A protein has these predicted regions:
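C-terminal motif of bacterial Sec signal peptides marking the signal peptidase cleavage site
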Residues: 16-17
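Short, internal strand/loop/helix patches
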Residues: 308-342, 346-349
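Sec-dependent signal peptide recognition
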Residues: 2-11
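A non-transmembrane, solvent-exposed segment enriched in polar/low-complexity residues
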Residues: 20-170
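Conserved helix-turn-beta segment immediately C-terminal to the redox Cys motif
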Residues: 214, 276-298, 368-371
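Conserved redox-active cysteine motifs that mediate thiol-disulfide chemistry
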Residues: 258, 266-283
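N-terminal "domain-start" segment that seeds a small globular fold
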Residues: 221-254, 318, 364-367, 371-372
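Non-catalytic, surface beta->alpha helical segment in thiol-disulfide oxidoreductase systems
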Residues: 339, 351-374
């Protein structure tokens, strides 16, 4: 499938909403271009947020391959322009006219919009990173390490990769910070191009730059509100209080454990990934439990019997609390939980220091802050 190099950016459009703004005039935009291989080409446009999959036909000159479509939009939005079978371009429409050309090799070029120019720059950076001498050498060394089953060498290659990736992500962060405010930046960040925990300060900086007329657009409002929600559990934030009943009905507060490191683990009996991770969590708890460390399991079950059964079956000997309200749990709402398993490590002062700890990452993080059995 041939498409503009949006890579993973359009895979996870968590902020995409194209609901109309109260405006009689709207924004008039013309999408035009030329398809070199015009035989059997059929051009149409579709909004990403259109759950009805309504397509807007675009007139194509069959003899020249030229096409053009003028439309009026009330909001900036994300669209897919279908050009021919298996060929499409993902577009951000906002104020500026856009030109889309397809050459004889079916390569797509998009121009005319600062939002699309930003996407192109990010894609170029990504291509340069993938083909850089450092990455080429890294891939060669990784293949050798795997072929020889050298676990030490494999780990060394992974560490080198993290260093290269950090440098690359810093370049991306600089680009989008400089380009803000921009609808293109919202699209890039919505695709998880930058880790939300490690680069949350970038999300905040971008959100702060959207003000005034920018806030007339629902996409921008949703983005800024999402950043506010993310801040609740951002690393460095004070963990919200938890005050829920344990299996005996006694209420337990997170603040009761101040002075200790506390791993808060959101889970449930019905959650397969949670249950598969529990043996790893048991191993970590048995290794590090002591005066300075505790685990609080927050169950999103609905039935107490199910909750108790899972605790017993998995041998979970730490503190357990639940109001048995599924994702409507007050703790789930306060922590903005929309998927489990989810965990946070909270320091003795109540500050979130790590998140989403699973597998070996859990053990490495606990070793960073604790001594076994301390």
């Amino acid at each position: 499938m041939i498409k503009i190099l949006f890579k993973a950016i359009f895979i996870s459009v968590i902020f995409a909403s194209c609901t109309g703004k109260d405006s009689e005039k709207g924004m008039e935009i013309t999408i035009s271009g030329k398809i070199f291989n015009k035989e059997n080409a059929v051009v149409s446009l579709q909004a990403w947020a259109d759950t009805l999959n309504t397509t807007i036909p675009v007139e194509l000159n069959a003899s020249t391959g030229d096409f053009s479509k003028k439309l009026t939009i009330q909001e900036p939005g994300f669209y897919r322009l279908f050009l021919s079978e298996g060929i499409f371009a993902d577009l951000i429409l906002f104020k500026n006219d856009i030109r889309v050309d397809v050459d004889e090799n079916n390569r797509i070029t998009v121009s005319g919009s600062p939002e699309m120019d930003l996407i192109s720059r990010i894609d170029s950076l990504r291509d340069s990173f993938d083909l850089s001498p450092g990455m080429v050498a890294l891939n060669e060394d990784f293949s050798k390490a795997v072929d020889s089953n050298d676990e030490v060498a494999i780990e060394q290659v992974r560490e080198r990769y993290q260093g290269l990736l950090k440098d690359f992500n810093n370049q991306i962060a600089a680009q989008i910070t400089e380009a803000s405010p921009s609808i293109g930046v919202i699209q890039i960040l919505s695709g998880n191009t930058l880790d939300r925990d490690e680069y949350f300060s970038v999300y905040e900086q971008v959100a702060e730059k959207f003000s005034g007329e920018w806030l007339d657009y629902s996409l921008v409002r949703e983005f800024t509100e999402k950043v506010k929600m993310l801040k609740i559990t951002a690393i460095g934030s004070v963990a919200p209080e938890i005050n829920l009943p344990d299996p005996t009905g006694k209420f337990v507060k997170l603040s009761d454990f101040r002075g200790k490191y506390v791993l808060v683990d959101f889970w449930a009996k019905w959650c397969g990934p949670c249950r598969r991770e529990n043996p790893n969590l048991v191993k970590a708890y048995n290794k590090f439990k002591g005066e300075n460390f505790e685990v609080i399991g927050v169950s999103l079950d609905r039935n107490k019997e199910d909750w108790m059964q899972a605790i017993a079956e998995d041998g979970l000997s730490w503190v357990h609390v639940s109001d048995l309200k599924y994702f409507n749990s007050v703790a789930a709402r306060d922590y903005n939980i929309n998927a489990i398993p989810f965990s946070l490590l909270i320091d003795p002062n109540g500050i979130i220091v790590a998140k989403s700890l699973r597998g070996e990452a859990l053990h490495r993080t606990l070793e960073k802050y604790l001594k076994p059995g301390a």
